[in-house]
Amino acid sequence: MSASGPANYEYVVARIRHRRAGLFGDDEYRKLLRMGTGEIARFMEDSTYKDAVDSLASRHRGMDLVEYALNEGLAAEFDALLSWSEGRLYDQLAKYLRKFDAWNVKTVFRGLYSHADTDAIRADLVDAGEFDAAFLDELLSADSVETVVDALSGTIFDTYLEPAFADYEDEDSLVPLENAVDRAYYENLNPSQPATAAQDSPEALYAEFLTAEIDFRNARNALRLARSGVSVDPAAYFIEGGTLFEASEMTTLVERQSDLVSRIQDSTYGDELSTALTALEESDSLIGFEHALDRALLSYSDHLSYVYPTSVCPVLAYVLAKEREVDNIRAIARGREAGMSEDEIQAELVML
């Protein structure tokens, strides 16, 4: 593990190929759909989550055990990725994994806003970013959204959250804060590439991957704003670094959803997002659209991995795939706990 020296893409990609083959597939998900939470935890013991389940089983049971084991297993997996990585790859991966800092900040915001208890919020935190356990505990101990914003002073989220907090107070909506967190994360990834970089250079491939993710995030955020009715300036929460939209046109696109959908359809992502747009039009469901967006991003990341097999692309694609696995297992366990039908739970899963 070192941020200096040459990148060891070939070595890390070879190890990831083995790990990716062990991800849950359709057969595993079908089995989980018929299990209770206790059975799901036992099923996880026979998988890569064994160490996490074993270490937590004396303190937790049922749904709590599943939740904590998933997050601990995810954090351990990404710690391993970092430990294998060298040079530019280490730097690229470490920055990318800050997404879990963003996730944790938004999770604490949501918990405080909904008056959830501390244990419920803690169960959703993933210790895989740069924030250490002590700082996460500090965020968890906050008694208000404003206290969390103050605690984040000096982090990459600092300057983004200050103006967003005023909008949050005016609108009583988390949308401004969540969009500000996304902007802080993505814009600090520095996805732009030097003009002289070759198309298959490490800089260019990293930029291409992140540009697609930013474009998909802007599409998601634009539609959320269009549906939320919150009277904030959409351009103020636009994420720089994509190619799908310009900040100057966001207000018009958010106000006229048909124009927004047409823009996505006519873009370079039109084919990848056709299923997502169809889901949006047929069911008028933003959740369905967001799930389809997630599937499209997984597919696009796999495409980049196929075209550039010895690069950062397969590494970041594996991060996305592992995240989706955890999200799917959690959705199944929560659905079973809530008494949802198999079809209802199936609709919550993101699979290719």
Curated annotation (Swiss-Prot):
It holds the Pfam family vATP-synt_AC39. One of its GO terms (molecular function) is proton-transporting ATP synthase activity, rotational mechanism. It comes from the Archaea. InterPro entries: ATPase_csu/dsu_sf (IPR036079), ATPase_V0-cplx_csu (IPR014272), ATPase_V0-cplx_csu/dsu (IPR002843), V-ATPase_V0D/AC39_subunit (IPR050873), V-type_ATPase_csu/dsu (IPR035067), V-type_ATPase_csu/dsu_dom_3 (IPR044911). It is a peripheral membrane protein. Keywords: ATP synthesis, Cell membrane, Hydrogen ion transport, Ion transport, Membrane, Transport. The keyword Transport applies. SUPFAM superfamilies: V-type ATP synthase subunit C. Belongs to the V-ATPase V0D/AC39 subunit family. Component of the A-type ATP synthase that produces ATP from ADP in the presence of a proton gradient across the membrane. This is A-type ATP synthase subunit C. It comes from Halobacterium salinarum (strain ATCC 700922 / JCM 11081 / NRC-1) (Halobacterium halobium). The gene is atpC.
